[in-house]
């Protein structure tokens, strides 16, 4: 159990949170992946396929659990083809959401995603 805990801590330590163009990501420095995280999003959101932080490029591969949850004035989301998974409760309680573009690259949708 101690080894598993150290592994989990090590995995989390290999990254950091960044905000790029109003979108909050956790970037994994080991795999060069970016995970979209929660924030107070509103209006029309276009998630980029790649982001750059401090000269390093990261590919956006997933949306964290609840990343858009309770964003009551979110109206549309465009998801890039680099994304393969969308977490649980990702779009829950988005009362004004009228349009979402989900590419065929998304192979995993979490529970109660909408």
Across the structure, where does each feature detected by a protein language model lie?
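Short, ordered beta-strand-loop transition motifs
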Residues: 19-31
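Secondary-structure transition/turn motif
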Residues: 29-44
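Short, intrinsically disordered, charge-balanced linker/junction segments flanking boundaries
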Residues: 108-114
